[in-house]
Amino acid sequence: FTMDETWNGRDIFIRFGGVRSAFYVWLNGNYIGYSQGSKTPAEFNITELVQNGENKLAVEVYRFSDGSYIEGQDTWRVSGLERDVYLYAAPKTRISDFFVYADLNEDGRSANFSVKVDLFNPERFTGKYKIDAVLKGKRVLYKMDYIVAIDSTNSVEFQTTFSKVKPWSAETPYLYNLKIMLTDPQGNLVESFTQKVGFKRVEVKNGNLLVNGKAVMFRGVNRHEWDPVVGRSITEETMIRDIQLMKQHNINAVRTSHYPNQERWY
């Protein structure tokens, strides 16, 4: 692959979405690392090994590993790169993770909402950074910002309550858009993320599973990531086809076999 020079000064990662069953990785003749676990993504920081211009990546895949035993349940034993492999660059000071909590209250209208943002600053750049969180439906429902001095790692949490939200359900899957932004001391946008958010309430009462206060009977199936033509390399089109087939047969729940599925499925 060819390195994009606009990525200079950023941390560069390579991500393997899924490799069965284990693999070693080298970049430009240098050993990067090893991973096993066919359905668990593996990510490596290659900042120190990547070079401007042409780079040579080598991957050695093993069909079986000492983790194969727990993966060998009711499945076809095929091996290789099953999911996407891609590079991405991230700023040195960045949002490392975030968690959204959206809980519909028992009245079915009001809700509690919080966002926890984890920050990463290994080189301890100084100055005041700003973090914005904006939740929007047909209109802006919530907007807040914090000014923080980032240490090596720290977190910021936004919390609020809403008197009225539009609930999410399988019949009316209404979603809000949450945007999280990190701005540096000079006012430059460093990083931003967008996440869909739905407000729902799931509970068990008197032996019944309730979603937003209404009893739901699960009619579920077990699903493997499998295509009769391409095997385990599932595309979005294959996922949509499976969902359409399930909806045609009134299926409303899916057990994703015994392993994590591709993120797109969720």
Predicted segments, located by residue:
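Accessory beta-strand-rich segments of carbohydrate-active enzymes
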Residues: F1-D97, P122-E123, R139, A253-Y266
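Beta-strand-rich binding/interaction modules
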Residues: L27, S110-V148, V156-F158, L178
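Conserved, mostly hydrophobic/aromatic
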Residues: G29, V85, Y176, G213, ...
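Short strand-edge motifs at loop-to-beta-strand transitions and within beta-strands
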Residues: T40-F44, N154-T160
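Extracellular recognition modules
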Residues: A58-E60, N177-M181
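Short beta-strand edge segments in extracellular beta-sheet folds
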Residues: Y88, I147-A149, K196-K200
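N-terminal carbohydrate-binding accessory modules
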Residues: F99, K179-H249
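Short, solvent-exposed loop/linker segments at the N-terminal edge
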Residues: A102-A111
